[in-house]
Amino acid sequence: MKQHIILFLMFTLCYTSCNRKANVSDVGLPKSEEKSLVALGQLWGFLKYHHPAVANGNYDWDMELIKRIPLVCEAKNDSVWKKLLDNWLDSLPPVPENPNKKLPNLEIKLKPDYGELFNPEYFYPKTIDKIRFILDNAVVTTNRYVKVDEKQQGQLFITNEPFYNELLYPELSYRLLALFRYWNIINYFFPYRELCDQKWSTVLTEMLPEFVYAKNREEYIFACLKLVTKIDDSHGTLSPNLNIGLLSVPFEVQFIENQLVVTRFTGNDSYVKEKIKIGDVITSINGESIDAIVKKMLPYTPASNYPVKLRGISSSMFLSGNSTIVNIVVQRDEKTFHFKIRRYDRRLLNATDYGNPQPDKEGYRILDNNIGYVLPPSCKVEEREQGVKKVLDGTKGVIIDMRCYPSNDYIIPSFKAHLKLRQEYNMMISKPNVSYPGYFFMHKLDSISQETKNLHIPKVVIIVNEYTQSAAEDYVMEFQIIPGSVVIGSTTAGADGRVVNFDLPGNIYTRMTGWGVYYPDGSNLQRAGAKIDEVVKPTIAGIKAGRDELLERAIEIINESNH
């Protein structure tokens, strides 16, 4: 009981100290407090992944941080908090000297960034020397907080991170714990740290006020969402996401020719189907222009690139909410219409999944003019062998529609076997190493290539767009190995590599990409997306006419190749 009272008083002091200068989130922290918290958060994360005693779980490391936050905030000057951090280092078991420590003999794709750990403005020179000694000598072979499973090709797992579900609106120390936990995980175990628009070492300082001054659970969740958005990763989701309401209108929209266009009905509301037309352009929602809404939502929409940000905004956020009625303004044929549209429970609507363009179609079929067509989400294990044979044997070519997320039936080996393709190195990946936090090392994965030059390979056209993400992008890379294959469409999601899940205080769940994926020449798929041979995008006129212009172009390419 006495310990709980002491901790409560420390939290109260911390909150008062860190909030005494301001009470809104757009006001910065006093410089001294900003520096001291950055130093504390970065040292805490460094020790978590580098010091053997901490990595082994000998301490309740969250609580070690929480106990020190009030002390750092209340420090009267820099010398006080710098001494506190130096004493903290001295309190840990000494690390033995290890002159034999060296990096693995592997190509380095990404090197660590230690932020302010070696900056004398943040630490005493003697403290920096101690940090350097730990870095150069400590050996961590297993870590309570992170695991790399080589049996799963280096799959990364973030482990033993409590989410404190009883703290729906965490007090200040736990909000800072969330910020420090996330920042350090990204700093040491995110493979694309160097691709972020903002230098990651500057993010901690910028985001401190957002977490310090979050006045309620909603502001805290939005601070977390803004933080996740800064990794520029389409895998970087956050749950709960307050941008997404429980209700939604009974139609889907998509950005086409830089305008928000109605593309498909998802419910049976007769009023909506009477008033709204496919191809309508929505110019305003609840009195706010589309451009203004996009600008407001971009900082809270995690994605690898701009097309995927628009995908997220249009598919989940624009027309969803918790009120039953939404007011929209529609432009159609130079006329303007105002409608009140009812929202429905999202679960009752027939929404497409990851952009699957034809959810009711079979996985393998033959189009007109004897062209094979594969829709991976609809592919079933029991149909695979006959299906692959059906679309490849005697056809002019095959279209693989990757504007979607594939099913669990991995069809690549069957294509490889049917086309008599052999294994060859194609895809490159970068993986982390628990013993060397912050480093990512390059490895090769097997893929496919042609075995016999004289073998007839049918023309293969792969269709992609912003819904082509993760495993779908893997498929594209694999199919690109087939000689003569062509990729058409627009920028893909740019988020390949296995997903890593972890928790933040306040019952919050988030994700990130856990390993790097690259083309054989070392070029990035992350953020840039899959390599495209011909850019093809839908038009508003095509949507109005009910045409699939990308599919039409794919058919044209195959027909042209047979002339």
What are these regions (language model features)?
Residues 33, 38-41, 45, 115-150, ...:
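PDZ/PDZ-like domain segments forming the peptide/carboxylate-binding groove
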